[in-house]
Amino acid sequence: MSDIQQNYSSKPKNGPAMFRALVLPRKGFNTAVGLPVIKATWKGAQADKKALNDYLVTLNLGKSPDLPILYPHVMAGSMHMNMLSHKTFPIRLLGSVHLKNRITQYQAIPVNAVMDLHSEIASYRLVEKGLEFDFTTVATINGEKVWDEVSVYFQAGRFGGKTNPSEEKSFELDSLKDPEKTGSWKVPNNRGKKYAKITGDYNPIHMSSLAAKLFGFKRDIAHGFGVLAEAIEYSSAIEQAGGVEKALQVDVVFKGPVYLNSDVYLRQNTQQNANRFDVYCGENPKPSICGEVVAV
């Protein structure tokens, strides 16, 4: 099968993509076939001022002349949705879990920057409990790379990984041992709907308690990237790693849900040019999110 290329000159629409994700039948992953090569490019991407302001207000983030380090991922979200909902993609979107991210920002990105965003569904790995597949995104300004990421998704299933796993492994972050508790905050009950309106991520598990229960959760859950943004803010992770003047890398592993209307707290260890933190939800003794910000 030849590569699939999607090109955009403005922000892709999410509605049709969500419809395809919900309605179109999927063949399911087949190791003999693999994944199709799907690429997308959004030229002239620029942060919408109202959406950016709503993002900052909703997540209690401070204003800055530069974009938050996670924001290019938010901007590319609708492009990702259109790629994952393409008719040739064999995996049902609602059955996939956003598992990990590695983001590298090579320089601060001004809020009014005009970027080109390029994404590609890249490699996959067979693991014991299913399949991991990678999504790469690169942001350039005048041809210079300023930001990139690898998003790792997980699909549960029997694909042979238990007996014949892939040699390549994705990165991991283990829970901190005896970390200092450094902060806490409340994830409000309306966060799912507010964040979805800003980002276009209307996954039912964030919108409805009933829908979330159908997927095995006790109630609706917060968007992981929203909670991660708050954790980076509360932990002062970027400042501890040297500030936006330096090239920075953010690693995150989403290990469990953060429920809406819950109290969350932060534990962290800080070293020179590095900040390692875990986010806990309510009384759960295990962290829901493990993250790290380091200078590179």
Positions of the model-derived regions?
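Hot-dog-fold acyl-thioester-processing enzymes
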Residues: M1-K100, G160-S166, F171-G242
